[in-house]
Amino acid sequence: MSGLLVSLQGAVAQGVLWGIMVLGVYITFRLMNIADMTVDGSFALGACVCAVLVVNKGVNPVLALLVAVAAGVVAGAVTGILHTVFEIPAILAGILTQISLWSINLRIMGGKSNLPLLKVKTLISGLAASFGMTQAQASMIVGIVLALSLIHISEPTRPY
């Protein structure tokens, strides 16, 4: 039974991460009605920037997260410039940016496809250590809080 709970915790932790990317795809495809594939490359760009800053440079995880968000914003801006200034169709601009980001991500990572985060302090490990819980439990709590926050924010306001 404990093996099932550990697997469930891992699945929820990964689901939270992939859910963020799915929200980006949903916003561009459904709400903005633009076929934009940049989110695929920019999601990985943020992860690469954050991992390199935390592992190789020893930067605080919160600051690394903010820099990663800024890198994603720059990637989105490149897509926007390709679409508006150079008048490339949105789907093609997104695909061009996505393909470019694959190479850029490998360059950022120093030619490696991954970096081990096992011995590095992250946001989740800091939270887990502060409250005396495992990292999987901290991931689940963060995921639940984020999900409830997004549900609360996305609900339409009703006049009373």
Regions found by a protein language model. Give the residues of each.
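Extracellular/periplasmic helix-loop junction at the C-terminal end of a transmembrane helix
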Residues: L101-S130
